[in-house]
């Protein structure tokens, strides 16, 4: 498999770890059509520190919404089945019942957005989250450095999906970007 970077310049994908990303030359044409009203920007910036982004009566609702979008993640090198099971219980019940009751949200069925684990821990998360709608996310593709071949990355993604992951957090090869 070959990927063409520029005319007459190809890099075999199986050796992509050794490839160097030459980047692109800076081109200002993308900014030529942008007009900025400097005084309006300065006026807006001056008001930012004195304003709250969310009014007090809506803060709890926004915080609960944020909880529903969080991926609870455990990516410790010594993760165990027990760690994953505890994390999944927290994902199913992220806020104490008494606090939800004070907010009138006791029937909201609040959960986090997902639980993220290493590929080898997917079965434990799947077991703990059975019967819920909480998706499992897996870090695949050689986390954290991404220093495995493209073929191995694709294989690991396929295995993670087959094991039950609904979301895949991928790691790009940093040396291709930097």
Feature locations, PLM:
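Alpha/beta enzyme core
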Residues: 57-67, 78-110, 120-178
């Amino acid at each position: 498999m070959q990927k063409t970077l520029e005319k007459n310049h190809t890099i075999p994908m199986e050796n992509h770890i050794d490839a160097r990303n030459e980047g692109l030359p800076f081109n200002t044409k993308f900014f030529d059509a942008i007009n900025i009203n400097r005084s309006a920007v300065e006026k807006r910036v001056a008001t930012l520190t004195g304003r709250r982004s969310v009014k007090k009566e809506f803060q709890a609702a926004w915080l609960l919404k944020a909880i529903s979008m969080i991926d609870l993640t455990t990516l410790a090198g010594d993760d165990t089945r027990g760690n994953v099971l505890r994390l999944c219980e927290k994902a199913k019940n992220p806020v104490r019942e008494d606090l939800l009751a004070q907010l009138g949200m006791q029937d909201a069925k609040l959960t986090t957005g997902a639980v993220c684990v290493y590929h080898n821990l997917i079965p434990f998360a799947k077991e703990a989250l059975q019967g819920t709608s909480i998706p499992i996310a897996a870090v695949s593709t050689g986390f954290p450095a991404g220093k495995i071949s493209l073929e191995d990355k694709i294989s690991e993604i396929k295995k993670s999906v087959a094991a039950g992951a609904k979301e895949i957090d991928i790691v790009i090869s940093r040396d291709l970007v930097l």
